[in-house]
């Protein structure tokens, strides 16, 4: 058929560098044109089984060219720069995307990729669907929050931890996807004054006293990891620490521009409401019991 011939002609050999781009190409139903990805591209399931070329910041020219790609789509940190020069010098179309880490940025990314792959209508539809889901998450969260505490409209407080080592906790601040999700839901981020991903000192965490803490799933190893984090010196004395309201989130959803953005909001909303339910119970507890503690 004509349509089939047209498709054959337009078929690309695509390399995606960055989990978000891989996910978007699959969401646009062009996953069968992806010949290789970087090592962070583990979703959807089919993407796991595609040739992996290593970490997207450190791709090798040989590795990329060996796949005979026609197109390389890369997240902003894709590199090194000499690889990009050599690959485009070899005649591969290279497009590097740098988008703001928020819902608007995700929509733009989807639309740009859709345009590049000649599926603009599909991309427009996907972007609109994601926005609509995000709006529904916001409505549902606000409604449920109001039901718990009709009088108390103080924002919930949260923190998103991306790594934990001897130097302290590294958290998601301004211009990150967690911040964008918190903003939409009206949740206050304890690291909002920091730019990007930064170390936060223990006092700042205690002072903010988060109701709930989220952590990037990739940093958790073993069953004890979450309870271990609840006992962290910065966290133990906070509301979230005392009640061990520390929840893991899929790193690709929570840190990247994923088409699963609304599902990420849903996970944040669900855990924030658990914390709210617990607070409601605690605050209605009798003063006598409080004294006994």
Model-predicted segments: where are they?
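A ligand-binding cleft/hinge motif common to bilobed small-molecule-binding domains
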Residues: 78-89, 214-230
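Short secondary-structure boundary segments
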Residues: 18, 76-77, 99, 194-197, ...
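Structured C-terminal subdomain patch of bacterial secreted/periplasmic proteins
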Residues: 12-13, 105-115, 124, 135, ...
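A short, structured surface patch at a secondary-structure boundary
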Residues: 13-67, 71-77, 81, 190
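Basic- and aromatic-lined ligand-binding clefts that recognize polyanionic substrates
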Residues: 12-25, 122-185, 254, 281-293
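His/Asp/Glu-enriched short active-site or ligand-binding loop at hydrolase and phosphoryl-transfer sites
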Residues: 38, 174-197, 217, 247-248
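Flexible loop/hinge segments that line or gate small-molecule binding clefts
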Residues: 43, 84-112, 116, 246
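Short helices/loops that flank or line small-molecule/ion binding pockets
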Residues: 61-68, 90, 201-209
């Amino acid at each position: 058929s004509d349509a089939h011939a047209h498709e054959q002609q337009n078929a690309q050999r695509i390399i995606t560098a960055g989990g978000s781009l891989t996910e978007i190409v699959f969401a646009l139903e062009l996953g069968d044109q992806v010949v290789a990805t970087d090592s962070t591209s583990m979703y959807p399931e089919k993407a796991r089984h595609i040739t992996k070329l290593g970490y997207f910041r450190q791709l090798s020219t040989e590795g990329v060219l060996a796949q005979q790609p026609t197109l390389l789509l890369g997240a902003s940190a894709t590199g090194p720069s000499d690889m990009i020069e050599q690959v485009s010098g070899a005649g591969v179309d290279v497009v590097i995307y740098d988008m703001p880490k928020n819902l608007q940025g995700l929509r733009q990314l989807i639309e740009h990729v859709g345009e590049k792959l000649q599926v603009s209508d599909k991309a427009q539809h996907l972007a609109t669907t994601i926005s609509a889901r995000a709006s529904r998450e916001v409505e549902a969260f606000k409604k449920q929050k109001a039901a718990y505490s009709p009088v108390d409209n103080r924002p919930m407080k949260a923190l998103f931890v991306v790594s934990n080592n001897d130097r302290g906790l590294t958290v998601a601040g301004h211009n990150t996807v967690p911040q964008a999700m918190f903003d939409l839901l009206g949740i206050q981020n304890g690291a909002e004054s920091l730019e990007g991903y930064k170390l936060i000192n223990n006092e700042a965490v205690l002072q903010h006293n988060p109701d709930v803490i989220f952590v990037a799933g990739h940093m958790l190893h073993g069953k004890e990891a979450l309870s271990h984090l609840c006992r962290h010196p910065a966290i133990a004395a906070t509301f979230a620490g005392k009640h061990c309201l520390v929840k893991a989130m899929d790193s690709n959803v929570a840190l990247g521009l994923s088409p699963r953005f609304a599902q990420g909001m849903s996970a944040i909303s669900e855990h924030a409401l658990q914390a709210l339910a617990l607070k409601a119970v605690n605050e209605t507890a009798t003063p006598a019991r409080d004294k006994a503690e």
